[in-house]
């Protein structure tokens, strides 16, 4: 009997403390855009309004939704896609055991019950990409949905997509995804990498990581599985993912040739692209910029080629002494992408893997090629974002952003960090968040998270949480620095709650309410401490905010301005000091 993955096998949590799922009605019937509404308590009887924030958690935090992983989550986009009249259902390619990296299918593999569904593709001669619609002046439902999430006009969304400054990754075979946008004129987004390896993890664990990451705020997921059951794992993830899903197709193609890079062929890779597009992958990382002539340049590096995809293609190029087949077949790849609206994430296969290699000739040579490929993809109206480094010290970060905008004509930048130092294994979520905040401020559209396990091992769900929260901090800091019109509202609300000692509101308004409450309660667990006008850091007598309240109250009682109150209060304290003998505390 075939196994299954059920909600009982993974940890699913309701909405974050003090929050509830709300929906904003869109311009078309049935369109409901999710938000998370954070309640606030009153201040001396005066109401504090609830704060609405961007929500990526999908239906899992809706108390009215019953989680049934084997059925997948709702498909809000399905009717939008069909009513356009430019797609057709077809039989699709046959799923083979080799897709899961085995010769014979295992009866113990939990097959998704609806794997026999018919995929969609563009009708003959049609182009179904969001960029194609946008360039033809058409505002699609996905663009209207995104406009509500971002608090902007739908026409602005259309224009940003049409001009290539933003992408809306939305494969027509992933109708479960809630539309989102990646571009420097919108909220900075965060991607979370998940996926098994040859030595670790199960399908249930990877589905759990996906739900866990989106609960904490991941805007997209990349399934980087390199072990067994790659196809089946991806099917379970996509059918239950409320956010876009990306992959690196060369990983699965390599499994199909038993892990031998030189045995890769264009035909195997092409088959893998179609397989994943039919499943609903929203964006592909494709290392088409790793050219044969660039590989020798990496020989003088400290850490050589550190990208898995980049090293696979470099090995193939050197063995055959031929140009990268991803580059030579790029136009054919574009033809596949536009049939399903899969977006390009042009991979940085020659990114620096150490501070010593940052901004070197190999890295920027590849970037020049990615700029060339961007123009080709745009000729086909295929959406493109550009992947970036890597390991870069702080003083070299801005150059990366400036070069990408210039060379790649403003296409969205998607960076891994960058890590700003190499000396902190176990803390690389911090070393990279420093760089991520900076490059986000300079214009990067999406940040790929780094977990504490980077360079050390496969992250578990707790590492995923740590990585997502760390990168949400970096992304939000970048939004503030860029002057995003709504970014400061949550900061202002939390600051007000902090000054008014509304402890629960402080917890609830934070990115990780559970962690904030846990740390507070380690020293002040009593319920009364939730209304106390101090915490354990300073205690009741030395709380700066309590002293500020006292000064304001003194000013009010004595009809003084705050500065006058401080001056008068200081004089009174000086007089009191002298009258008591001028003795210091011992």
From Swiss-Prot:
Cofactor requirements of the protein: [4Fe-4S] cluster
UniProt binding sites for Zn(2+): 391, 455
Recorded catalytic activity of this chain's protein: 5-amino-1-(5-phospho-beta-D-ribosyl)imidazole + S-adenosyl-L-methionine = 4-amino-2-methyl-5-(phosphooxymethyl)pyrimidine + CO + 5'-deoxyadenosine + formate + L-methionine + 3 H(+)
Residues that bind [4Fe-4S] cluster: 535, 538, 543
Bias (Basic and acidic residues): 22-39
Alphabetized GO MF terms: 4 iron, 4 sulfur cluster binding; carbon-carbon lyase activity; zinc ion binding
One BP term from GO: thiamine biosynthetic process
Cofactor binding, note field: Binds 1 [4Fe-4S] cluster per subunit. The cluster is coordinated with 3 cysteines and an exchangeable S-adenosyl-L-methionine.
Record bears the keyword Metal-binding: yes
Pfam families cross-referenced by the UniProt entry: ThiC-associated (PF13667), ThiC_Rad_SAM (PF01964)
EC number: 4.1.99.17
Binding site for substrate: 193, 222, 251, 287, 307-309, 348-351, 387, 414
GO cellular component: cytosol
Keyword line: 4Fe-4S, Iron, Iron-sulfur, Lyase, Metal-binding, S-adenosyl-L-methionine, Thiamine biosynthesis, Zinc
Region ranges (Disordered): 1-58
Gene3D superfamilies: 6.10.250.620, Radical SAM ThiC family, central domain
Known pathway: Cofactor biosynthesis; thiamine diphosphate biosynthesis
Listed InterPro entries: ThiC (IPR037509), ThiC-associated_dom (IPR025747), ThiC/Bza_core_dom (IPR038521), ThiC/BzaA/B (IPR002817)
Stated role: Catalyzes the synthesis of the hydroxymethylpyrimidine phosphate (HMP-P) moiety of thiamine from aminoimidazole ribotide (AIR) in a radical S-adenosyl-L-methionine (SAM)-dependent reaction.
Family: Belongs to the ThiC family.
Protein's name according to its UniProt entry: Phosphomethylpyrimidine synthase
Source species: Bacillus anthracis
